[in-house]
Amino acid sequence: MTKRNRNNPSRKSKNSRKSAIRIIKDNENLTPREIARRKRAKRERERIYQRRRLALSVLGILIIIIPSFLIYKKLNTYGKEGYPAFRDEVLDDLSKTAFVSSTEGRSLTSAEKNADFDTLYETIVKNFAVDKSNIESFEKFTQKSDEYRKKITSSKTDQDFFILLGEYLAIINDSYTKILDKESYTDLFEYYKNKKESSMNEILGNPQVVNRYKRIINDKNVIESSVGIEKGYVLRITLPNFKVNEIEKMIDEVIKSVTSAPGISTMIIDLSDNNSLNNLFVNEFAKYFIHQDYNKEDLIFYRGNLIENTLKDMKADENSPYQTAFIKNTSSNYKEKIEHFNLDSYMYYDPVALKIIKDTTFASRNIYILTNSNTANEAIKLASIFKDSSNAYVVKNALDPNPTAADRIYEFPPSLFVLDHSGLIISLNTARSEKPNRYMDYNQRINSKYPISSMLSIIG
C-alpha cells in the first residue's frame, strides 16, 4: 500500500492558504490601506441595506394604500342599482326644486363636471331649435361657454355645479330648456317604468339618473292639486303641477263634486305657477273637458338626432295622441318660403298631428283659466287647447302687459337627454314648427292678491 506523501507540495499550498486566511482575519495589525478598504466596504454594505429597507418600506405602503383606495372607491362610487328594483327608493322625498343633498364624501370631480358640461353644450348646439326670436340668446349661450366652463371647473360642491348649469341654461331664455325637476322625473318614471320598448324607459331608468334623483331633497313645500266648489256653483280645479298618474283620482273627485252640485255649468282651471313639462297629463286631462275633438297638424323641423327617439316612440305607439310617419324628409328639399327661421340650420322635417278625442264622461261647461307670470310650457299648451276647442276665457294675473317667453305655445314636446356623470336629465326644445311661433292671447289681465275671488267676479 502506497503511503501518502505528507510533504505533498499541493496539499501544503492549500493548507498554507487556509492558514493564511485565518491569520489575516484574526490579525489585528492591519495596514492603514486595508483598514480604509474595509471601512469603504462596510459603508457600501450599509448603503445597500438602506436602499433595501427603503424599497421594502415603499412596497409595504403601496400594499396598504392600493387596496384601501380600491375599497374606498367601491364604497363611495355611484352604485349600479338594478331596474326596476330601485323604484321604491326613487319615490322617496318628492321635490319640485332640484336641491342636491350631501353625497357623504362622494362629490363629482372637476373632470366629471367638465365632461357633463361639454355634453350639455355640444348637445344643445347641435339640437336646439334656433329661430329669429331666440338667435341672439342662442349666440350669447355659445359665447359664454368658456366663462361657465371655468366657473364649473372651480366649483366646490355638486350643488354649486348644478346652480351654475341652471344659470347657463337660463341664458338661452327658453322655458322648455332646463334641468328636469324631481317632481316631473318621479311622475314620468312611474308612467314609463313598464314601457320597456320606449326610449323614455331607458333615460329615466338609467342607474346614474336614479342614483342622482333619489338624493334630491325637498327645497320647499309642494302644493298639491285640488278640486272644490266655489260659491256653490263654480267647479274649481287647481293644478300647480301635472301628474299623469293622479288623473284617475282627480277625475273621481270631479265626479263627486259635480254630483253633489248638479247645477254647475262653469269651471275654473287654476294653472298658477305651473311650468310642467308633462305633456302626457295635458292630453289625458283635456279629453274630459274639451267641448269637441281637438285636431292640430304641423310640419316639425329639427336640426339634430336627439328628437328622433321621441318621433320613433310616437310612430310605434298606436295609442299616442301624436301621430307621425317619421320619414325624415330632408329640409333642403322643402320648397316653401320660410321667413321666421333659417331653413339651412335644419336637417329634417316631418308632419306631426295631435288628436285628442273628447271623453263623454262630463257635459260641456263654460271654462275659465287662470294663469300667472310663472305659468309656462305644457300648462300654456293646455290653456291653448281649451281656448281653441272650447272657447275658454283665459286670464293672466300679472303686471307685464307684453308677451314673454313663458307665454309661448310649444307645438311639440321637449326632448330629454342625460348628463352621464351627474345623472341629471336635461329638457331641450328641439322642434320648430313651419308656422310662426304662437303666444297665448289672453282675454283679460288682472293684478290681484286673491285671484280666485277676482275670477269669480269676472264670471259674475
Report each predicted region and the residues it spans.
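N-terminal acidic, proline/glycine-rich, low-complexity intrinsically disordered segments
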Residues: 1-12
